[in-house]
A protein has these predicted regions:
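Small/aliphatic-rich secondary-structure junction motif
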Residues: 1, 88-153, 175
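Short secondary-structure boundary segments
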Residues: 49, 121, 181-183
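Acidic (E/D-rich), amphipathic helical modules within compact regulatory domains
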Residues: 42-58
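Charged helix-capping and loop-helix junction motifs
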Residues: 59-62, 133-137, 190-194
C-alpha cells in the first residue's frame, strides 16, 4: 500500500491538473474498479492495458474481465497510445439496444472537444435487423442534433470481417477514438476480444 501511495503522489505532483483526488483501494481489480466507479457515479473508466499475454489468450485478458465487471463505460488505452485531440469519434451502431450504451459518453466527448461523430453501421439485408439499425441511427442523430454535435451517418458493406471493416473506415477517415458498446451473451465473455 505504501508503494502505491508513493507512486500515486508522484504522478499527481507531476500533473498540471489541480482538481484531482487520489483513492487507493485494496481488493481484486476484477471487482473493485467497477464498484468504485459506480460508487462515485463515474462517467467513464480509463484503463491502460498491455494486451493479452500467455495464458490470458486462452482464459481471457485481465482488461476484458474488468470491463465485464461493471456497466460503467470504459476507455482502454494501450501502451504508446498518444491522444492529443478527440476531433473524430467513430461509433459502431448495431441492431441491439446495447449498442447504444456508449453514445452518451461519446456525445459528451464530442461536445466537450468540438468533435464530429461518425455513426457507422453494417448494411443488412435482413429487414427486421435493418429497421432496428435505422431506428438506432435516427434516435442517435436526433440526440446529436439536440445537443448540437456534428455527425455523419454511414452504412458500410461488411467484407467478411466487420472489425476489419470498422478499422479500415477509421484509418480512411482519420478517427481519433472508437466508441464501441460491448455486450456478450457468451458463457466465457472474458475470452471475447474487442
Amino acid at each position: 500500500m505504501h508503494e502505491a501511495k508513493s507512486k500515486l503522489n508522484e504522478i499527481l505532483s507531476s500533473s498540471s491538473y489541480r482538481n484531482l483526488e487520489k483513492h487507493i483501494k485494496n481488493g481484486s481489480i476484477f471487482n473493485i474498479i467497477g464498484e468504485f466507479a459506480e460508487e462515485k457515479s463515474a462517467t467513464a473508466i480509463i484503463m491502460g492495458t498491455h494486451g493479452a499475454k500467455g495464458m490470458q489468450k486462452i482464459f481471457g485478458s485481465f482488461a476484458m474481465k474488468v470491463i465485464i465487471s461493471t456497466s460503467t463505460p470504459f476507455m482502454v488505452v494501450q501502451k504508446d497510445s498518444e491522444i492529443k485531440k478527440v476531433n473524430r469519434i467513430c461509433i459502431n451502431i448495431k441492431s441491439s439496444a446495447e449498442s447504444m450504451q456508449i453514445t452518451r459518453l461519446a456525445s459528451y466527448l464530442a461536445k466537450t472537444y468540438h468533435g464530429k461523430i461518425h455513426i457507422i453501421a453494417e448494411k443488412s439485408f435482413d429487414k427486421s435487423k435493418a429497421v432496428k439499425i435505422k431506428n438506432n441511427m435516427v434516435l442517435l442523430s436526433k440526440h446529436l442534433n439536440k445537443i448540437e454535435v456534428d455527425y455523419k451517418l454511414e452504412l458500410l458493406d461488411n467484407n467478411n470481417d466487420w472489425g476489419q471493416t470498422v478499422l479500415k473506415y477509421g484509418r480512411e477517415n482519420s478517427m481519433d477514438l472508437y466508441a464501441y458498446s460491448y455486450d456478450s451473451d457468451r458463457f466465457l465473455a472474458s475470452n471475447d476480444k474487442f
